[in-house]
A protein has these predicted regions:
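Topology signature of small-to-medium multi-pass alpha-helical membrane proteins
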Residues: 1-143
Length: 143
């Protein structure tokens, strides 16, 4: 449980901080540098809008679910696992979509190691593991 909590925090916290920069100053160079790469520009208005929508969704849905779920899990409550499963589902779904959607743009710039680990892989891994673990705990299986 604690390993998954820590892995989730290490994975999600930098993303949420980067998105906060973007939400507070969406047209700033700092936001572009953090989210799409130093000196890079948005490919088009759809790229900008989808990034902004995902940032809002993460702050309005993913963060509250993950945070409340983590508190519930730390307290040993079943509702914590239910909220965590919801957060994990969001992380898994969004990042599987982005894994394929952004590959042609992101992969050449950052390389295989970063792309398949931190950039997308860890979000998919945490989402999958947290979803399975939460389901097992809700079913009554303890570790």
């Amino acid at each position: 449980t604690w390993a998954l909590l820590v892995f989730g925090a290490i994975t999600l916290l930098p993303l949420l901080l980067a998105q906060l920069t973007f939400l507070l100053r969406p047209h700033s160079q700092a936001a572009r540098d953090i989210l799409i790469g130093k000196g890079e520009n948005w490919r088009d208005r759809t790229h900008f809008r989808s990034a902004r929508g995902l940032a809002w969704a993460d702050w309005l849905l993913l963060l509250p679910l993950a945070l409340a779920g983590s508190i519930g899990i730390a307290l040993g409550s079943a509702w914590g696992y239910l909220l965590w499963a919801a957060a994990a589902t969001i992380s898994l779904y969004v990042n599987v979509v982005l894994w394929f959607m952004e590959r042609e743009y992101v992969y050449p710039r950052i390389g295989a190691l970063a792309y398949y680990t931190y950039y997308w892989g860890f979000f998919i891994l945490w989402g999958g593991l947290a979803l399975i673990y939460s389901g097992l705990r809700l079913y009554g299986i303890s570790f």
